[in-house]
């Protein structure tokens, strides 16, 4: 969108303010509100921020220049739930250059090796979330009647949340995000809204916009829309399954219908999958970045019969118990959860996948058994390893993964520093479970 086209767009839609928006290292949206007549400044010089005040930007309060959020003109859109406002996704710059700690910048750098081959990397995010209300300090599903022990696809649960779901879906559709289905998931108060896949950078921009809208629309209704991976201990958690493929402008390069395994996958797709499997422990840190994330990935079953989360490092066909599923002609990485920074997680996925492609790694045979029912002896016999079972294990794996660290640059060091602090803080916390179990036990 040219500057003149943008100004016309803003005028026609009576936009008064533009949200110059980027994310911190946690994937949380950060903004400044800029009067619409200063649009040109946002896409040239950028909106200025004190970088030290933002998590994970690797900046100091006494030396570094301001963090400048420079707008990507192709992302300018209305904010449907906030009349009179538009949003533009920004790349961080310092000293006139892209800021290497900005995760959108990090993703764009990883995408360069894809585009250099004449390829486009496509992703489709599947955000799961919990729609909740707070009653006397206790979190409950937004719908008091949403109490089924196995609520997946329940009509009543879906229908009674329709005010929120319709408002969010229509907001997304009005700005060109093609919502194609909505369902009630397998936990009480849990939903998923699916929208059409697109190139990886746009997909991450869409997910950020999705979270912004979901939070604000829920708040207007007196509700909480939570992307916490595991808000309830005995129910499935909130994932962010990532479907992926590579195209060359003519065809899907991940698809080969002559595949001997019957998954309709090409050699390129198998090499890519092998890279993801090789780097799975390190990917866990970036795709599942909180202490709560590993309550979702824990080995075991939930009350509904399955956690729907991949505790096992393997791939298969239409097998939802492994880390990678292939619905046919594409890969679905089931590892990420809804708390991840989509830009950083996607960048890590590209680094891992391309390692598999460059070195022609082999993922072995697909695993199509129900791994939730496997014993440890069966897992050992099949050579199937378990994903990290807590954040600390994942961080140690990331520290040792030179491929991922080298590809993503210094932002990984900053991520590790912050997340080790988070782990220590978590370990110091004395939980109600500990008090109830041990206070008078001895």
Swiss-Prot record:
One of its GO terms (biological process) is glutamine biosynthetic process. Induction: Induced during growth on methylamine. Pfam families: Gln-synt_C (PF00120). Residues 103-442 form the GS catalytic domain. GO terms for molecular function: ATP binding; glutamate-methylamine ligase activity; glutamine synthetase activity. It comes from Methyloversatilis universalis (strain ATCC BAA-1314 / DSM 25237 / JCM 13912 / CCUG 52030 / FAM5). PANTHER family: GAMMA-GLUTAMYLPUTRESCINE SYNTHETASE (PTHR43785), TYPE-1 GLUTAMINE SYNTHETASE 2 (PTHR43785:SF12). Its cofactor is Mg(2+). It comes from the Bacteria. This is Glutamate--methylamine ligase. Its EC number is 6.3.4.12. It catalyses: methylamine + L-glutamate + ATP = N(5)-methyl-L-glutamine + ADP + phosphate + H(+). No activity is detected with Mn(2+). Disulfide bonds: none annotated.
